[in-house]
């Protein structure tokens, strides 16, 4: 099974020694090159990186990579192996292609474990780290185009939980 996990990055950094991982520079069209393949070849939205961040790389991968499975991780956050102790060296805990394939044999989507943040909610975390207006515009678009999804957004935003990576390097 061909699996490609793009490693979203903007600078040189350690990448697992597994051919499944492909480091891709996000926003390559608008930022200085860092030595990795950029998200600005083929069908791409690299020039919109300021608005879409890592999604420019995911868009690039979906339109330019021929793989059975395509995924994305942040350059410092990888999926952790279930087979290794959580006290092991973080770099040795990164999930391998073999282990990921065994998981994908039973499911189509792999997500990290949910983490609980008691200091703030998903909504307050987003507006502190990003732009409140973006979230409000997103809510308005959902209300207008897909109103059946609005109760879910209303449910998720006040929660103090999020799905994030469990293995940071």
Where are these regions (language model features)?
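ER/Golgi luminal nucleotide-sugar-dependent glycosyltransferases, focusing on the catalytic module
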Residues: 1-169
